[in-house]
Amino acid sequence: MPKKEKMAKTPLSDEKQLLLFQQKLLAEEEMAKKKERLLSQFLKDKLAKEEHNSALNLNKINTQWRTVLREVKTRELHKDIEILSQTFERVVDCKDNVIKSLAKDLSEAEEQYAHALRSHLHNVDQLLALQRHRLSLLEESYNMELEALTKEFETERKTIIDQHEKEIHYLQDIFMAMEQNYIDSEYESKLEFQSMWNDLKNMNLEEKHFLRLHLENRVEDLWRKFQDVLKNYTDATEDRKAAFETLQVKDEKSSKEIEVQMKKIQKLQDAITISKGKIMIHSRESEDENRYIRNDKELVLVQLRKLKAQRTQARAASQKNLVRLTLESNATLKALRKIVDKGEKILKLAEICRKFETEEEKVLPFYSSVLTPKEQEGIQKNNLEELTEELTKVMVDYIGMENFWKRYNKVKLEQLSLQHRRAQLLDINGKLREMLKQYLDGISVSDEVLSQLNPLFIVNYQSNLLQPLSIRIAHPGDKQHPTT
């Protein structure tokens, strides 16, 4: 009996060992899972702290950056305000001068307007008197012509009405005849259509009956052939059919046995693969989770570095764009101010020069071209062929300035001609002054005249012209002439 008890206790100890081993494995798995959870929680807390710290640092940097930008902006605004105040004072002074000049022009224009209005009213009164007399004469002639036209209209109206009535009767007769012809032709066409329709119907019925008989005969022949072929096939395959049925029964039995054995083998293989798979899955899951956590950590660090770099780049780019925008805006404002000032100067000069325009320039401000239209078209085509597309597009925007450049060129030509004429007159004036001076010098005697060279002027038998020195050798036979 004790031997039997010992033999019975040995398998129980093995089962306990297996249970203890399984419990240890489960405890180790639970400990590993707890460690993984604690590690993931620690990493999440650390990531949250880093995000919180990065947000605080970003807010601090933004506040300091805003203060720096405000200081820079205030300095720029102070400079802009000083520049604007100076420009405003300068513009106010210019405007005051313009207002004074315009007030003078306005007073002169009012005087001219009053004088022109008086002369205009006098001329209008004279024209009204002439127009009333002319209207009375025209009214008399109009009444006479109206009576003659009414008489002619009445006679023409009567003749036209009579002719219209005759034409209406003629057209009614024609319409009745055409309607009768249409009714006759319609009746004949209907009869022809009915006869043709009946003929076609009869032909279709005959063709249909013939085709039906032909098809019925053909179907009967095909059915006889099919019955013969079926009978021959059944007679030839009866023996093969019996052998096939016996083999089919044997095949079903063997297939059932094979299926039972395969199911048993499959169950055993499934159990083995499941146990192996569980072990591999647990090990792989732990390795994969650790690897995923490491990869996530590296990715988070890389993304954090990228975000910091992008933030610095974006800040530098925004600062550059802001500086460039301010510089470009200031440059554009200056250019626009120059253009506006230039336009105002042009308008002022135009108003000032309008006083000095002649009557011809007021009536025809733009001179007509000397060239013919064909020559102008040829010149325009040549210019367009030589220019590029961009220049042509730009020139289209400035077509409205042609009249301005006409007046400008006209004024420039007049200026050049006046300068040339002035130079000629100054030259003539200088020559006349020189001639007048020579004439006056020949008439009068003064210190200036005495100091200048003059071959006609002799004082004490001596001229003021420089004479060349002559050396003369005295001979014994020569006589000296007394000086006069």
Swiss-Prot record:
Task: State the oligomer form and interacting partners.
Answer: Component of the nexin-dynein regulatory complex (N-DRC). Interacts with DRC1.
**Coiled-coil ranges per UniProt:** 92-160, 374-403
One biological process term from GO is: axonemal dynein complex assembly
Give the superkingdom in one word. Answer: Eukaryota
Record bears the keyword Cytoplasm: yes
The entry's linked illness reads: Ciliary dyskinesia, primary, 27: A disorder characterized by abnormalities of motile cilia. Respiratory infections leading to chronic inflammation and bronchiectasis are recurrent, due to defects in the respiratory cilia. Patients may exhibit randomization of left-right body asymmetry and situs inversus, due to dysfunction of monocilia at the embryonic node. Primary ciliary dyskinesia associated with situs inversus is referred to as Kartagener syndrome.
Which organism is this protein's natural source?
A: Homo sapiens
Cellular localisation: Cytoplasm, Cytoskeleton, Flagellum basal body; Cell projection, Cilium, Flagellum; Cytoplasm, Cytoskeleton, Flagellum axoneme
The UniProt similarity line reads: Belongs to the DRC2 family.
Q: Does the keyword Coiled coil apply?
A: yes
Q: Describe tissue expression.
A: Highly expressed in adult testis, in spermatocytes and spermatids. Also observed in spermatogonia. Not detected in Leydig cells, nor in fetal testis (at protein level).
Keywords from the UniProt entry: Cell projection, Ciliopathy, Cilium, Coiled coil, Cytoplasm, Cytoskeleton, Flagellum, Kartagener syndrome, Primary ciliary dyskinesia
Reported function: Component of the nexin-dynein regulatory complex (N-DRC), a key regulator of ciliary/flagellar motility which maintains the alignment and integrity of the distal axoneme and regulates microtubule sliding in motile axonemes. Plays a critical role in the assembly of N-DRC and also stabilizes the assembly of multiple inner dynein arms and radial spokes. Coassembles with DRC1 to form a central scaffold needed for assembly of the N-DRC and its attachment to the outer doublet microtubules.
GO-annotated cellular components: axonemal dynein complex; axoneme; ciliary basal body; motile cilium
Put simply, this protein is called Dynein regulatory complex subunit 2
Coarse class of the primary localization is cytoplasm
